[in-house]
Each structure stands twice: as structure tokens, then as C-alpha cells.
């Protein structure tokens, strides 16, 4: 499968609507809203397209103190396990990451395992701390979680790679 990885600031309403559709299918309703995909000067969104359709995205936030947060990475279910998430991160590290910056991300831990664990490990990020159920008070209130049964059962695992 040939995937075009495009670095762009998403500004067209149609593009944002497509990215919201990807987000909703993965993370549930209202997890991301329209303004989430409108980048500020300290944010970067890298998108993956296949045949002119958005199939994935990576959002990076450049924080103070040489710290970078992988805020979210999402790939449409039909396109998962095809290297798209790896290519999004590879594109970021090759074109935008400074070795003086540390980088971190939160991964969901559900009964089926830690989502994105292998992906983050591929980029030398280590699971350093279980932060517990940090989404518990927002789950099915601020957004409709696709993993929630009777109660929130997701935990946040902090993955981190220090600067060199």
C-alpha cells in the first residue's frame, strides 16, 4: 500500500471534518472537537492520506522547557497495522524533532493491553509510570468512550524518551 504522508497545517473545513471522522471512529464522540485540529504556533499536525482521503493523524505539542508531547496519534481501523502510525512518527522525528528535546506520550491501557506500546517502544520511548484512571471523570461525560462498559476501565501509561 502506498501512503502519502503529508505535513500540513489543517485549515480547510473539509479536511478538519475528515480528521474528526477518523477521531470519532477511534476514540468516540466528542473526544476531539473542531478546534483541536486548528494548529497554534506551538503545535504540529502530520496527516496520512491514502488516495486523497485522510486515514491518520499525529498531533504534536511543543511545550516549554524543551519538552514535546505526542498529544494524539490515530489511524483509521481499516488502515491499522500497515505502518502508517510508524511513518507518521518517523516523519516527525526526521523533519521536526531536536535531539535536545525530551518527548512523552500517554497510552491507553485497557483489558486488551496497552495501546501503542510497541509503537512507542519502536521509537525508544519507555513506559515509565502508570498514571491510573485519569480520564475517569470525563469518560462518557465530555466524550463517549468506545471502551467503557459499566465504568471507566482505561488507565494512562506514561511513555517517555529523554533528550540526548
Regions found by a protein language model. Give the residues of each.
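Active-site beta-strand termini and strand-to-loop segments that position acidic
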Residues: 49-51, 161-162
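Short loop/turn motifs at secondary-structure junctions and domain boundaries
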Residues: 36-42
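Short amphipathic alpha-helix that is part of the acyltransferase structural core
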Residues: 1-31
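Conserved acetyl-CoA-binding loop-helix of GNAT-fold acetyltransferases
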Residues: 75, 81-94, 118
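Conserved GNAT acetyl-CoA-binding A-motif
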Residues: 96-109
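Conserved beta-strand in the GNAT
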Residues: 47, 53-62, 67-74
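C-terminal "cap" of GNAT-fold acetyltransferases
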Residues: 133-164
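Conserved active-site alpha-helix within GNAT-family acetyltransferase domains
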Residues: 109-144
Amino acid at each position: 500500500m502506498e501512503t502519502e504522508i503529508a505535513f500540513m497545517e489543517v485549515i480547510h473545513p473539509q479536511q478538519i471534518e475528515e480528521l474528526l471522522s477518523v477521531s470519532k471512529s477511534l476514540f468516540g464522540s466528542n473526544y476531539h472537537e473542531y478546534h483541536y485540529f486548528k494548529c497554534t504556533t506551538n503545535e504540529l499536525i502530520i496527516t496520512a492520506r491514502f488516495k486523497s482521503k485522510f486515514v491518520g493523524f499525529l498531533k504534536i505539542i511543543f511545550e516549554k522547557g524543551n519538552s514535546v508531547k505526542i498529544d494524539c496519534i490515530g489511524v483509521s481501523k481499516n488502515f491499522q497495522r500497515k505502518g502508517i502510525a510508524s511513518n507518521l512518527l518517523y516523519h516527525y522525528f526526521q523533519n521536526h524533532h531536536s535531539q535536545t528535546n525530551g518527548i512523552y506520550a500517554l497510552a491507553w491501557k485497557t483489558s486488551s493491553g496497552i495501546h501503542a506500546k510497541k509503537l512507542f517502544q519502536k521509537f525508544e520511548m519507555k513506559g515509565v509510570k502508570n498514571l491510573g484512571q485519569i480520564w475517569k471523570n470525563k469518560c462518557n461525560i465530555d466524550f463517549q468512550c468506545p471502551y467503557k462498559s459499566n465504568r471507566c476501565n482505561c488507565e494512562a501509561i506514561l511513555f517517555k524518551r529523554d533528550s540526548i
